[in-house]
Amino acid sequence: YFLGAIPEEFGWTSTLTEPLTKEYGPIKAGIIIGGVWGVWHVIPWSWVHPVGWIAGMCLLNVLMRTAMIYAYVYGGKSLFTGLVFHTMINVTMGIFLNYGSHINTWIFSVWMAIILLSLIYFIKRESKASKC
């Protein structure tokens, strides 16, 4: 699970995150990288999952990548944050039969959106408080 995350995170985190975050900010960078990340996995997912599951997982990838970008930016800009996050995703999916075939990716996306919006809210609130 960890070894599989290494080459991807060298691309997503080490190569793309910094320039795209500087150019577009963390949310737009998350949409761009997360969208590409989702499309990157469509073919292997299509071997065992229906279209609705795949669409939900692509949305989930955008949300997770955005959270990963915030973790990267506020976690010391370390590749390790992306590797740990990606490994946790791989392990979580791997414990389910057929790589998560029994989970509802749309419900997971809603929960991830709530978590992400909370994270952004607290970061912005903390940022405003530290300026005072």
Predicted regions and their residues:
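Hydrophobic transmembrane alpha-helices of multi-pass small-molecule transporters
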Residues: 41, 45, 65, 90-94, ...
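Short, Lys/Arg-enriched, Gly/Pro-containing loop segments at transmembrane-helix junctions
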Residues: 128-132
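Membrane-interface helix/loop boundary segments of multi-pass membrane proteins
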Residues: 7-33, 70-78
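Juxtamembrane helix-loop-helix connectors linking adjacent transmembrane helices
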Residues: 1-23, 46-53, 57, 98
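Hydrophobic core of alpha-helical transmembrane segments in multi-pass integral membrane proteins
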Residues: 108-126
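Functionally important transmembrane alpha-helices
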Residues: 54-109
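Residue-level hotspots within the lipid-embedded alpha helices of multi-pass solute transporters
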Residues: 1-6, 34, 38, 57-62, ...
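Membrane-helix boundary elements
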Residues: 27-49
